[in-house]
């Protein structure tokens, strides 16, 4: 997907870089596949901030995405390619032969009118979903299940993919976008291909107001706060006095936060980079 630059007619346009969304074919979503998305503003059940820097922004409707791809051996036709405000990748509306409509993540190169299908004996083509055990080594996949039948959890954002590196018994070794090598059960489903919108990482908002439209509020530096508000606060706003930490005193910027013992450790062949 190409990038769109702007002439610096205003300060907000100077440096702004957008995605050229010429491939989108619909402006409004399929109503039966959407539902309301309540605005949480970063608050938990107790009404207190649980996630900072969230609030405001444009009202959204959530699009129900088919991460499971459990309509096996039923062909479907791509009707539209649409924008989804809840994720970085575009989505595709698929009409299946049994009358059902579902949204799927749109991989790179997916076109309107293309046939997609899921199952154990389907063609190895982009947007088709198969068990990992029947996909050859070296293929790129996305929307990978970690638990059989749970639905895809890995490689779901714009431009991401996992590579099938090897097969060993009942497991398949995947090279994940983070660089981690992980074993996944051969019966877990994955979708062929790399996700589209690969230039999403190269976009620039251009002004703070566009971040506010997305529901992102300002981030205040800890050094600019008072000592009561942050471990790095005080000292005329200039001196740190210690290594970088979170507002709760946890080391950050490179500090490993993964727990020492997790059930999934035995499935990780090599750690993320």
UniProtKB/Swiss-Prot annotation:
Keywords tagged on the record: Ribonucleoprotein, Ribosomal protein, RNA-binding, rRNA-binding
Record has Amino-acid biosynthesis as a keyword: no
UniProt biased composition (Basic residues): 255-273
GO molecular function: rRNA binding; structural constituent of ribosome; transferase activity
Pfam family for this entry, one: Ribosomal_L2_C
InterPro entries xrefs: NA-bd_OB-fold (IPR012340), Rib_uL2_dom2 (IPR014722), Ribosomal_uL2 (IPR002171), Ribosomal_uL2_bac/org-type (IPR005880), Ribosomal_uL2_C (IPR022669), Ribosomal_uL2_dom3 (IPR014726), Ribosomal_uL2_RNA-bd_dom (IPR022666), Translation_prot_SH3-like_sf (IPR008991)
Disordered as annotated region, ranges: 28-55, 222-273
Biological processes per GO annotation: cytoplasmic translation
Gene Ontology CC: large ribosomal subunit
Gene3D superfamilies, A to Z: 2.30.30.30, Nucleic acid-binding proteins, Ribosomal protein L2, domain 3
Protein role: One of the primary rRNA binding proteins. Required for association of the 30S and 50S subunits to form the 70S ribosome, for tRNA binding and peptide bond formation. It has been suggested to have peptidyltransferase activity; this is somewhat controversial. Makes several contacts with the 16S rRNA in the 70S ribosome.
Subunit field text: Part of the 50S ribosomal subunit. Forms a bridge to the 30S subunit in the 70S ribosome.
NCBIfam families: rplB_bact
UniProt family annotation: Belongs to the universal ribosomal protein uL2 family.
Name of the protein this chain belongs to: Large ribosomal subunit protein uL2
């Amino acid at each position: 997907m190409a990038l769109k630059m702007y002439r610096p007619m205003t300060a907000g346009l100077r440096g702004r870089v957008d995605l050229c969304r010429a491939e989108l074919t619909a402006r409004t979503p399929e109503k039966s596949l959407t539902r309301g998305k309540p605005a949480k503003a970063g608050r938990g059940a107790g009404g207190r901030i649980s996630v900072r820097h969230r609030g405001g922004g444009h009202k959204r409707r959530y699009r129900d995405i088919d991460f499971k791809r459990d309509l096996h051996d039923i062909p479907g036709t791509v009707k539209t390619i649409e924008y989804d405000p809840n994720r970085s990748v575009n989505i595709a509306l698929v009409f299946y032969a049994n009358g059902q409509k579902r949204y799927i993540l749109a991989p790179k190169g997916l076109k309107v009118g293309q046939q997609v299908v899921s199952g154990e004996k389907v063609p190895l083509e982009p947007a088709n979903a198969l068990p990992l055990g029947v996909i050859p080594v070296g293929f790129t996949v996305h929307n990978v299940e970690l638990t059989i039948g749970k639905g895809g959890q890995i490689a779901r954002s714009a431009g991401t993919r996992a590579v099938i590196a090897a097969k060993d018994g009942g497991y398949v070794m995947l090279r994940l976008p983070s660089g981690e090598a992980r074993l996944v059960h051969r019966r877990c489903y994955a979708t062929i291909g790399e996700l589209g919108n690969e230039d999403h990482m190269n976009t620039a908002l251009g002004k703070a107001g566009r971040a506010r439209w997305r529901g992102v509020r300002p981030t205040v530096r800890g050094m600019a706060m008072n000592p009561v508000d942050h471990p790095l606060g005080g000292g005329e706003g200039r001196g740190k006095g210690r290594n970088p930490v979170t507002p709760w005193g946890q080391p950050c910027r490179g500090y490993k936060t993964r727990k020492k013992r997790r059930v999934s450790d035995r499935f990780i062949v090599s750690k993320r980079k």
